[in-house]
Swiss-Prot record:
It comes from Zea mays. Keywords: Actin-binding, Cytoplasm. This is Actin-depolymerizing factor 3. GO terms for molecular function: actin filament binding. Residues 7-139 form the ADF-H domain. GO terms for biological process: actin filament depolymerization. Gene3D superfamilies: Severin (3.40.20.10). It is found in: Cytoplasm. Signal peptide: none annotated. Its main location: cytoplasm. It holds the Pfam family Cofilin_ADF. InterPro entries: ADF-H, ADF-H/Gelsolin-like_dom_sf, ADF/Cofilin. Expressed in all tissues except pollen. Actin-depolymerizing protein. Severs actin filaments (F-actin) and binds to actin monomers.
Amino acid sequence: MANARSGVAVNDECMLKFGELQSKRLHRFITFKMDDKFKEIVVDQVGDRATSYDDFTNSLPENDCRYAIYDFDFVTAEDVQKSRIFYILWSPSSAKVKSKMLYASSNQKFKSGLNGIQVELQATDASEISLDEIKDRAR
């Protein structure tokens, strides 16, 4: 599926892995990246259900952009177990301008194919996706 705005296609495996996370709950997180020629969005990393939140945040590169999905489990004040699927556009300040522009221009089209996202975030540094921030946004 090509993105009309940026010309970037989405590899079919991206939607397959998202479906596995959403419906089958096989994964804790998925990160997606653009291939080296900025022509296609592909699966970068997949974390299994036992993966910690720190492992997820540590998987995000300091100097490059990513799209990420995180399945966050939590317990409400009423002691009810819940889950929220987060979509994160990771665009660190230190990333190259070209990368930031292409990720931003492809963001809406890519995100629109991921039905079931409950919380969206854009982050430029780790503080914007701290565990406390995620907990606050999940409620």
